[in-house]
Amino acid sequence: MMKDYYTWTYPDIPENVSQELRQLKSSLVVVGIVGRSKCDQANKMQAFGMEPPIEHKAKEGQVQCYYKLGTSSLLLHFETTYDEAILGQMIDVCMEDVETPFDFDSFYERMRCRFVRMMLLALHACHIVVYVETGQTFDPTLVTVFQLLKFAREQHLMQFLPQMLRETPSARMSERARLCAPRILFLFENFPRDEPKTRECVSAYEFQTEDCIYELLRHHNIVTNSSSSSLVALPNNKQFVFFNAHEQLHEDKLLKAIDCLNQAMYKPDAKEEEEDLEILELAPFEGFVKPYNLPVDDKELEKQQYKQDHTVWHFLQRHVQDALLGCFDEGSFKQHSQQGQFQLLNIHEWHNYMATLHKLLVENAKDPNQETSNEDYKLFLKSFDESLNYEKKFWAHLCELGLKKGIAAYKNAAPANYGNSTHRQLLADATVAFEEEGRGPQAKAALAKMAAICQKHWQDGRQQCEQLSLRSHPCTLPKNLPHEKHNSGVIHISSCNCGRTQGRREDPFNLRQANYEFYEHIAQMCNLCVKVKQYQLPIFEPSVSDYRAAAFEAAFPLLHTGKSGAPQDEDGEEDAEDEEGQEQQQPAEEQRQNTASNGCSQPLSPTFGSDLNMSIAGFGASLNESQASSEQLSNSEQNSTSSGTSSADTENELVVELQELHAKKEARDDAGPADAFSTSTTEYLPGLVHTVSNFGLLPLFPSWSLACVGPSSIYSHNTGLQEHFQSGFLSGANFLLPWDVQLRLVHAPKQQHHTHHQQQHLGKKQQRWKKQGDRLSLKIFVGMEYECSRGHRFMMCAPDRVLRGGADIERETCSKVVHNNMPLYYPCPCRSQTSYLAQLMRIHVVTPKAPVNIIVDPKVCVGKGKYTFTLGSIVPPRLSQSAYWIIRLPYVYQGDDVLIAPPEKLEPDDPLAGGYLLPGMFGVAETDPTLDLNEPGRMGASAAGNFTRI
């Protein structure tokens, strides 16, 4: 099929086409086609019945020319970034640059700037501009493009273009720098499918769109009353919007070919009735009295005629005729245009003019550093894109306003000194103030700038020390000012060692403040602490002035070897293995007897057996030294009998061996004093004593306290602990738990070389015990006291239950406390909006009136089982008879060199996660009148070996 038009790529005009265009002389009307397209070739000419060559490839900035023979219009097809094919090419180029992240805002600005540049060329080189829209409605963003075009023409082009045109063959165009105020037409390639495609409906749709466009362009001063100040022109009383309602554009070529094939292969059935054939034979010629076509009514004829006339080409030619007749601006503007405003050029003049515009606006723009003597043009090349990015300036202005508002909000609310948490809160408030004004792509960078300014303001003499206390509270003192003592401003309420006096304590920042200095200070204000009898726990005694804290490897070698006791040599390990093998071969009955009479342990319940080894480990070598006496005790127990007593009655009894007075002295003399264990006098233990710390290292100060606050009579089980004696207890939680312990006394065998006087004296004493029977029933009162930071104190009657009064105390209640792991932290039952954690701080023990001593050896497991802290005494303390004793636990626990902070909140499913007190801390032994309980250092290492753990 022969084409009735020519097409070429600017500026390569064919010679034959050039000759045809020369014949038009000064009757050439240039029409520019711009807008959107969806096809691969970026073709917007299909509505005009034209298309580029098959080998044509879309390219940004390319101009494809079309000329139809016998017409006076030259059509310029501008390929811009609004064409989907070219837009896809730009996206592919951006995606290939993997080092630079894809920024949509900058990409959109760059795409729009390139389109504006090509539109400027079209508006200055054409008489008529047809904007093609693939949608069904007018795109409001086009108004923004028109505003940018008007700004670019008035602020850039008119500053250099008239002057630079005077220096070219197109000097006659220098005054207005354009052919005319170009008439803008709008072509919509698609009509709404749900609307009927009648003349009335299509015309109504076109008129409605024209009114909308006219109002928008007039409102934004794109079209004014003067042609010189108008960017474009709109015809008066003439259609400038066209909807393609009847022709299908950009249809699938394969589907079209298949449809043509089906039509070619279709053959209508020509058979007719026999009667008709007889009549047709009488006809003088074929087709006689038969109509050529089916009858058509007037409406159908009118509809067909409307389809033929309603084409884009006819729509365009009406405006071309206005240009040829010289009435192009008539009715478009209220003010009469000046002479020479509208100009028609011949092909040669127009070609020179187009070449100048294309070079100035498109080609030179590829190199912003293009050498030129015109300063305005140089500014145009360098800042054209930046000047069009009005959104960027708008967002920058908003972010600047938000930045000022946010910084002001931060500085106005900032106190004289504040910490990191306050700084973060102020910064969050400043961010909220910023977001009231600032937004857009630059908001992220502006927020970072605001954060840096606020950070600098904070660090400029307003920063707090923020050294964390042992309770994780920051110091509130200024960082830049020297201070000897930290202060977090947090105040806790704590009781003294004896529990009688409560006082306010500052948040501690070191272990000495937490576990020693506060209790020494409050003891001076307590009239009971100065009177009580304190048990002297072992502490470091330096022999030199330059003593220091032990290094980690020296202080805690067992953590690296993985052992829980003192290092042994290879021979010792082999002996231990041999002993273990022999022990496994013993009969079950013999093992039971040895366990019952080993002088160290007699469990009352199965819950105690699992903690037996750990409990024994704390007593040191004294237990090993008492193995010989344990064997003698076992033989003595087997020979002893008790008349009228069944085995069932003795099942839960504890066996206590009674030794002769001279035997106790000999055993103690053989073992030597407790201070025979060598301790370092140059290095001290930096933390608390635990089961794997070196026995030779002692702490600088005691973190525990063991004190006798008075006789047992000061406690009445009917009234509990009174406020004048123990203050701060919650109602109903101030009772100790009674504990009944059954003992069976076993006498050691007498030595043959004893004097008759000693035998007679001891015999009388033993006879006096026998009158009381060989069994003793001890009543001990025990209380596990918890204390929260508000000073609330309460007792626990079970690991998961707070004592609520005397009604909660039953016969076996105390066994739940002493034979189970007691949590180190428990939620305080006080009524407060904030959940406070109470800490196990004291263990109350009221010893019985009996010829035995209660031995205490508390062990606290903290740090998920990593550390088990002890009193640090090789010899477990013996409590005097018929007395009220209180063990005060450490306020803060510190392992090797790391603080073990309390949990922020207690998990309901794991109350022991923060730590727990191990069971089996109590023991019982025969009273030895030769021992001085107040001076444990003088006690023999085996003084505590002969006792029974409860």
From Swiss-Prot:
Family: Belongs to the SMG8 family.
Key words, A-Z: Nonsense-mediated mRNA decay
Organism, scientific name: Drosophila yakuba
Record's protein name: Nonsense-mediated mRNA decay factor SMG8
Compositional bias segments (type: Acidic residues): 568-582
Domain of life, per lineage: Eukaryota
Region (Disordered): 560-607, 624-651
Keyword Transmembrane helix: no
A biological process term (GO) from this entry: nuclear-transcribed mRNA catabolic process, nonsense-mediated decay
PANTHER family: AMPLIFIED IN BREAST CANCER 2-RELATED (PTHR13091), NONSENSE-MEDIATED MRNA DECAY FACTOR SMG8 (PTHR13091:SF0)
Polar residues composition-biased segments: 593-607
UniProt feature, compositional bias: Low complexity: 624-648
Record carries keyword Nuclease: no
Function: Involved in nonsense-mediated decay (NMD) of mRNAs containing premature stop codons. Probable component of kinase complex containing nonC and recruited to stalled ribosomes.
